[in-house]
């Protein structure tokens, strides 16, 4: 029996339908919002997965082409299984607020699939998918500390808006996705146009208020139609093993975890664990994994207690201290721009490549085909954390970190009119000990400046952490990897000196107050300004020109009606220009012509040819052309490529011309002046108008006859 739950969000009905579709799933919900219809299913296996110590949760978001009335491209004309970047990012977006809400010790396979069945071209389905996944889990038997829900927040004309449309987002200064539970936020993802810390804080708590009706609706669904929840996983009974591990390790563990360097810290901790196992002897036989789990939990307690009690961090820094920073630009001579950014033991190499408009990334989405002229690709090779493993394609994490850094940099990029290049940045993480995505932001900013890209300002990023026990709180700036793993929050903030451009927050606990978030944002600003100051010592302004090996791009405007003249039949003319000059030419429908060339000389030659091909005759202008055809009444002269005009026989010379061929022959070069262009585009030319007037010949007067008077007869 189908049951419907409706809640008003942002002036539209958010509808949850239960009991009609996908009844074999552990939980299934059809979510409707605007024209969006998303089927969210959750399935939990009845058997535990053996041999693992993590939650085996998989989340997949799928956009079907039929949802927007489209047929997929490609030879097979069907979705081929490999997720798009948008699908990958949305899958991560759904996963992040859900994963922390599962109980510790749950090792059953859980799969969540959100399928877009109908797509609203003005409302992104990602929010509907996240809410649908949360509702499907709420009514499933899976143990889950929900409900959880999400909204998107924009700011249009100074007013905060819930779930703004795509049209509104174009004008919005904020684009935040906020997920929360009844007593706090658990996830934030988004970008901004130089927002202040107070604006971000206001938007977050505005979102928290707007989440409450959705949370109440999802909770009601669980109460009315939800299946009986499975009992929480049993807490392992380790007997007296935890006490034995504490006796053997606690006193020495603090010295191990407070080693300043990551490698030394890891080696000391691993060595101590081996010593504990040896000391336990037969007690630990067959229970090595249990000992490791107990030891890891003890390590977490020791670190957190040390930070809160000593007001210092495991590498010796204070809460607001930033690790030492150094960097360099221009170390790769053949590239178009490069920079290395190092903060403590985290290091990223960013490389800029400039391309032409034809290098833009073509993307198929529910909205149709779009093109992307700025791409940032983040790579996290195994050696950056001292590991050896097989290399594969980019992981979801790599795609997500690249998207975060791309969002941070985008607001400072020049417009296509100012800088008509396609820009690709690749960030190679060479060493990682916390916040490699924010190191990518810093390195990218420097690499763009090194390449001569006229960015509006430098961008830096920092990751903030939190340790909270009761009323004791420590907000940490520029966190290490261990502080991320053992802490309660990972809050990444990026921006310029003027404001925030991107942020990402994942909270592992609830009940974080406005004051704590305000403190985190304030510390992040101080850290960002410090990092920007250090970056400015390396490079503070974009280079005055492009690198030697960067392509030279010139943009000229032609009459759109003349595009066919440049392309020619079957592309013949444009191919000739490319072969003759060695340039690359891209022509847009509005008549903009992008000419990419290795040298300025070749670009100038291509411009001259295109100008000649697209030039239009002007009344009064003088042209030198070739006689194409001789007629009885005049001569047709080609004054511009594919542009002929008529020189009437009366306009050939000042004197009367009996035959056109007496003055001109086919193939002759002749200079003419445009007298008139009629409504049909016919051109009247004159040769005579450019000739000196012929001198007038005065006819000789005949000699006067003198009459001799006749003699009269006398």
Regions found by a protein language model. Name each.
Residues 25-111, 116-118, 123, 189, ...:
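Glycine-rich, flexible beta-strand/loop modules in the N-terminal catalytic cores of phosphate-handling
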Residues 549-553, 560-714:
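Single-stranded RNA-binding regions, centering on S1/OB-family and related RNA-binding modules
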Residues 1-45, 49, 56, 230-368, ...:
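Extended amphipathic alpha-helical scaffolds
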């Amino acid at each position: 029996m189908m049951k419907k739950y409706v809640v008003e969000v942002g002036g539209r009905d958010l509808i949850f339908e239960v009991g009609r579709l996908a009844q074999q799933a552990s939980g299934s919900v059809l979510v409707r919002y605007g024209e969006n219809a998303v089927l969210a299913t959750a399935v939990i296996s009845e058997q535990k997965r053996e041999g693992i110590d993590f939650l085996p949760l998989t989340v997949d978001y799928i956009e079907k082409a039929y949802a927007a009335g489209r047929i997929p491209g490609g030879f097979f004309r069907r979705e081929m299984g490999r997720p798009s970047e948008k699908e990958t990012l949305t899958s991560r977006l759904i996963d992040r607020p859900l994963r922390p809400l599962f109980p510790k010790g749950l090792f059953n396979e859980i799969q969540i699939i959100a399928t877009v069945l109908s797509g609203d071209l003005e409302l992104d389905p990602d929010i509907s998918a996240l809410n649908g996944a949360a509702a499907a889990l709420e009514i499933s038997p899976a143990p889950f500390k929900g409900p959880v829900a999400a909204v998107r927040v924009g700011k249009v004309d100074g007013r905060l808006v819930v779930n703004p449309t795509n049209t509104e987002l174009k004008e919005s200064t904020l684009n935040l996705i906020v997920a929360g539970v009844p007593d706090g936020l658990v996830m934030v993802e988004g970008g901004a146009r130089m927002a202040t810390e107070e604006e971000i804080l206001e938007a977050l708590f505005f979102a928290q208020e707007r989440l409450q009706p959705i949370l109440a609706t999802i909770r009601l669904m669980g109460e009315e139609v939800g299946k009986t929840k499975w009992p929480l996983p049993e807490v392992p009974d380790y007997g007296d093993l935890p006490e034995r591990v504490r006796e053997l390790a606690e006193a020495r563990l603090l010295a191990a975890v407070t080693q300043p360097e990551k490698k030394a810290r890891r080696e000391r901790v691993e060595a101590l664990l081996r010593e504990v196992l040896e000391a336990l002897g037969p007690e630990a036989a067959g229970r090595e994994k249990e000992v490791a789990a107990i030891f890891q939990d003890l390590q977490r307690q020791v670190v957190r207690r040390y930070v809160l009690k000593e007001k210092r961090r495991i590498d010796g820094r204070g809460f607001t201290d930033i690790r030492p920073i150094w960097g360099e630009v221009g170390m790769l001579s053949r590239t178009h721009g490069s920079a290395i950014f190092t903060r403590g033991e985290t290091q990223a190499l960013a490389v800029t490549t400039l391309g032409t408009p034809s290098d833009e990334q073509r993307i198929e989405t529910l909205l149709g085909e779009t093109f992307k002229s700025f791409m940032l690709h983040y790579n996290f090779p195994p050696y950056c954390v001292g590991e050896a493993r097989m290399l594969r394609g980019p992981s979801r994490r790599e795609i997500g970190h690249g998207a975060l850094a791309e969002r941070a940099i985008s607001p400072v990029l020049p417009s296509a009119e100012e800088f008509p290049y396609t820009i690709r940045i690749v960030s190679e993480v060479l060493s990682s000990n916390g916040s490699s995505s924010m190191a990518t932001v810093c390195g990218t900013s420097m690499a763009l400046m090194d390449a001569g890209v006229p960015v509006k300002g430098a961008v830096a990023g920092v990751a903030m952490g939190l340790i909270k026990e009761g009323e004791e709180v420590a907000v940490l700036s520029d966190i290490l990897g261990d502080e991320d793993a053992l802490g309660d929050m990972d809050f990444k903030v990026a921006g310029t000196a003027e404001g925030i451009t991107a942020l990402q927050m994942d909270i592992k606990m609830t009940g974080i107050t406005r004051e704590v978030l305000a403190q985190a944002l304030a510390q992040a600003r101080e850290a960002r300004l410090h990092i920007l100051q250090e970056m400015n010592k390396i490079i503070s302004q974009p280079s005055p020109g492009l690198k030697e090996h960067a392509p030279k791009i010139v943009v000229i405007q032609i009459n759109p009606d003349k595009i066919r003249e440049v392309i020619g039949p079957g592309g013949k003319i444009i191919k000739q220009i490319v072969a003759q000059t060695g340039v690359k030419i891209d022509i847009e429908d509005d008549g903009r012509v992008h000419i990419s060339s290795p040298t300025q000389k070749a670009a100038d030659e291509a411009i001259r040819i295109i100008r000649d091909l697209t030039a239009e005759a002007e009344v009064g202008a003088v042209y030198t052309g070739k006689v194409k055809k001789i007629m009885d009444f005049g001569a047709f002269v080609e004054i511009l490529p594919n542009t002929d005009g008529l020189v009437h026989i009366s306009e050939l010379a000042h004197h009367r011309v009996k035959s056109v061929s007496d003055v001109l022959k086919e193939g002759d070069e002749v200079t003419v002046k445009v007298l008139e262009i009629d409504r049909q585009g016919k051109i009247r030319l004159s040769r005579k108008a450019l000739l000196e007037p012929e001198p007038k010949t005065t006819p000789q007067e005949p000699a006067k006859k003198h009459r001799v008077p006749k003699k009269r007869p006398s």
